[in-house]
C-alpha cells in the first residue's frame, strides 16, 4: 500500500517537473529560441495594475457582448432569408395522385372499424 502511494507521488513529481521545465536549447539556434521563450514568459507574467485591469475589463465586457450579439443577429437574419416557408418543389412533384396528399389520409378516423368490418367473425 505504501509502495503504491510512493510510486504515485514520484510519478506526479516527475510529470510536474517535466511540464514546467523549458525545452532543451540547441547550439545553432538556441539564442533566438531562448530569447523568444524568455520574452513570452515575461509577457505572460506581466500584468497591468488593478485599476487599469478593471477599467480595461469593463470596457471589453460592455463592448464585446454587444458586438458579438450584433454579429450573431446579422448572421441569423441573413441565413433566415434562405429558408422557404412554402412547400418545397419536391413535394409538388408528387402530383395529385399521391396517396398521402397534404399529409391527410381520407379515412383516418375509422381505421379500426374498417378492419373489423372486413373480417367479420362468426361467433
UniProtKB/Swiss-Prot annotation:
Q: In which tissues is it expressed?
A: Expressed in the ovary, kidney, gill, gastrointestinal tract and pituitary. Differentially expressed in the brain in the optic tectum-thalamus, hypothalamus, telencephalon, olfactory bulb and tract, preoptic region and posterior brain region. Expression is strongest in the hypothalamus, where localization is to the posterior ventrolateral region. Expression in the brain is transiently increased 2 hours after feeding. Abundant in the sensory layers of the vagal lobe and along the border of the sensory region of the lobe and the deep fiber laye.
Q: Which GO terms describe its cellular component?
A: axon; extracellular space
Signal peptide boundaries: 1-19
As stated in the Swiss-Prot or TrEMBL entry, residues carrying the post-translational modification Sulfotyrosine are 105, 119, 121
Provide the transmembrane region boundaries.
Answer: none
Keyword Secreted assigned: yes
Query: Segment Disordered: which positions?
Result: 43-67
Q: How is it modified after translation?
A: The precursor is cleaved by proteases to produce a number of active cholecystokinins.
Q: Which GO terms describe its biological process?
A: digestion; feeding behavior; growth hormone secretion; peptide hormone secretion
GO MF term set: hormone activity; neuropeptide hormone activity
Residue ranges annotated as propeptide are: 20-103, 115-123
At what positions is Phenylalanine amide found? 111
- Induction summary: By lipopolysaccharide (LPS); in hypothalamus.
Keywords for the protein's UniProt record, in alphabetical order: Amidation, Cleavage on pair of basic residues, Hormone, Secreted, Signal, Sulfation
* Record's subcellular location: Secreted
The primary site where this protein sits is secreted
Which cysteine pairs are covalently linked by disulfides here? none
As for what it does, the entry says:
This peptide hormone induces gall bladder contraction and the release of pancreatic enzymes in the gut. Induces the secretion of gonadotropin and growth hormone from the pituitary. Suppresses food intake and decreases the expression of preprosomatostatin genes in the forebrain.
Entry similarity comment: Belongs to the gastrin/cholecystokinin family.
Q: What is this protein called?
A: Cholecystokinin
Amino acid at each position: 500500500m505504501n509502495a503504491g502511494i510512493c510510486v504515485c507521488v514520484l510519478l506526479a513529481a516527475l510529470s510536474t517537473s517535466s511540464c514546467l521545465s523549458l525545452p532543451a536549447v540547441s547550439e545553432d539556434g538556441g539564442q533566438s529560441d531562448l530569447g523568444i521563450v524568455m520574452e513570452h514568459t515575461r509577457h505572460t507574467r506581466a500584468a497591468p495594475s488593478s485599476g487599469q485591469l478593471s477599467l480595461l475589463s469593463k470596457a471589453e465586457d460592455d463592448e464585446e457582448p454587444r458586438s458579438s450579439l450584433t454579429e450573431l443577429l446579422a448572421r441569423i437574419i441573413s441565413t433566415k432569408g434562405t429558408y422557404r416557408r412554402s412547400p418545397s418543389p419536391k413535394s409538388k412533384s408528387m402530383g395529385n395522385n399521391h396517396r398521402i396528399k397534404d399529409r391527410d389520409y381520407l379515412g383516418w378516423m375509422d381505421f379500426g372499424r374498417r378492419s373489423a368490418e372486413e373480417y367479420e367473425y362468426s361467433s
